[in-house]
Amino acid sequence: MNYFPWLTLIVVLPISAGSLIFFLPHRGNKVIRWYTIFICMLELLLTTYVFCYHFQLDDPLIQLVEDYKWINFFDFDWRLGIDGLSIGPILLTGFITTLATLAAWPVTRDSRLFHFLMLAMYSGQIGSFSSRDLLLFFIMWELELIPVYLLLSMWGGKKRLYSATKFILYTAGGSIFLLLGVLGIGLYGSNEPTLNFETSANQSYPVALEIIFYIGFFIAFAVKSPIIPLHTWLPDTHGEAHYSTCMLLAGILLKMGAYGLVRINMELLPHAHSIFSPWLVVVGTMQIIYAASTSSGQRNLKKRIAYSSVSHMGFIIIGIGSITDTGLNGAILQIISHGFLGAALFFLAGTSYDRIRLIYLDEMGGIAIPMPKIFTMFSILSMASLALPGMSGFVAELIVFFGIITSQKFLLMPKILITFVMAIGMILTPIYSLSMSRQMFYGYKLFNAPNSYFFDSGPRELFVLISIFLPVIGIGIYPDFVLSLSVDKVEAILSNFFYR
């Protein structure tokens, strides 16, 4: 047993070190940038160290548990712990946040506040992935929301205030349902409130009540990992935000919703989940088709990538709804894979916008000649996004396919229909992503412009892109990297579903 409070250190370090930014000397932005990157790197190394040396892979139970009394009055503890489900997203958070601070190098306006908000967001994300207490989960979920709102409303495009307001209305509306669900589960069935994950997981509820809880939590998580029809904040937000914020949004924020679905809706409410899972699969297939076909109609480059990430989230929802270990493992793999790919694509869109100052696809063209490196990386990563074999997206979508085919929950005809519709979605993906590349990079439009001299990407940008590209290839060739973390935990979750 390890008694050092590793997880508390990991959760508290970014925000407490970030608040020291305001006391740094006024010597331009260089000090602030390097300090922030140093904190992110330190945090990432610390997390990796803890997970390498203090985490047993073959143990599906919760590990590194910390439990400190916080508010005695209603049994509210600072309770942290990780298992195979949360270790992947936490490492992804560290990785993407470090790269996003590196991507935010050009930000010079109010850079202290900007970097502090990045670090505060980091703490909130790791806290919500590792909390083992429902109320603490809710608090971390909300803590993560405020920095995002400020990052959206202060740095970004012309309509950034509109999109930030839309974002906060959607997510705060979802959080009301989350709070109601947390309090309902905590106060049910005993005189003393229990907010502990472990006791709530062993608690049994009347079916009607469980369905109500399930719907409440589902609305909250459906806003966050946008499930249609609650996805409309996402394209606006991505269209206006600064691209380092976009990396955090696409890479981590969307994954919090999917993580919540698995962590709360599947673990705590298995009966209701078995009732709703066919509907989840139906919504997921509709989402793949709808978002892919909407994406090909977008003029705005960032909105097109945003719709593509809505479409990719459909696979995660299908995997969660299939209630098989294959499907759920595929969903977790897709969470990690799309975290890398979404961040990389938004970073590419942002860097090319920095150079040519155009965001509409029909005004671009011919960028491939002056910027070959950006063109190469964009081609490779959009191929990975359309699930090219050998890349991480392919493995994840394939495993989700197998999960839905081997599911005991569905009869043969629905399986054939769902698989067919998913295949159509996979055909629509190359249509929008390849036409995006064609409109941006081929042709002669910009090349004939008078000021047609553009810089290609520098070493910093190439470093960000290559360090995202390596895990994408690595997971694609050897998916057991990610699967070995979650496979025991997935079996433990699915053992609750007694009808299997």
Swiss-Prot record:
Enumerate the subcellular locations listed in this protein's record, separating them with semicolons: Plastid, Chloroplast thylakoid membrane
Keyword Plastid set for record: yes
The protein's annotated catalytic reaction(s) are: a plastoquinone + NADH + (n+1) H(+)(in) = a plastoquinol + NAD(+) + n H(+)(out); a plastoquinone + NADPH + (n+1) H(+)(in) = a plastoquinol + NADP(+) + n H(+)(out)
EC assignment: 7.1.1.-
The record's comment on protein family reads:
Belongs to the complex I subunit 4 family.
Q: Which InterPro entries match?
A: NADH_Q_OxRdtase_chain4, NADH_Q_OxRdtase_chainM/4, NADH_UbQ_OxRdtase, ND/Mrp_TM
Origin superkingdom? Eukaryota
Cite the source lineage.
Eukaryota, Viridiplantae, Streptophyta, Embryophyta, Tracheophyta
Q: List where the protein spans the membrane.
A: 4-24, 37-57, 87-107, 113-130, 134-154, 167-187, 208-228, 242-262, 272-292, 305-325, 330-350, 386-406, 416-436, 462-482
Q: Name one GO biological process term.
A: ATP synthesis coupled electron transport
Q: What is this protein called?
A: NAD(P)H-quinone oxidoreductase chain 4, chloroplastic
